[in-house]
Regions:
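Ubiquitin-like/PB1-type beta-grasp interaction modules and other compact soluble beta-rich domains
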Residues: 1-77
């Protein structure tokens, strides 16, 4: 087993839409959505069984090990 170096961010294990994912420690929800190329204006995020209604808070919400996210996309149509 290796220990991460002090200058390397630790990886955190998450579950996203039922699939295992990992992110660097300190990653915000906003940064995670950007890494997936998702526009926060067209998704709804459930974080640990709680729907996040305040999209402004995405930038300050740091993800933690064990977090469970469900991300739902809005799809237009007619």
């Amino acid at each position: 087993m290796t220990t991460p170096l002090a200058h390397e961010p630790s990886a955190l294990a998450l579950t996203v839409n039922g699939d295992p994912r990992s992110v660097a420690a300190g990653t915000t929800l906003s940064a995670f959505l950007a890494s997936l190329k998702l526009d926060p204006r067209v998704v709804v995020v459930e974080h640990n069984r709680e729907i996040l209604r305040d999209r402004e808070a995405y930038g300050s919400l740091e993800l933690s090990a064990g977090d469970v996210l469900e991300i739902v996309h809005f799809v237009g149509g007619g």
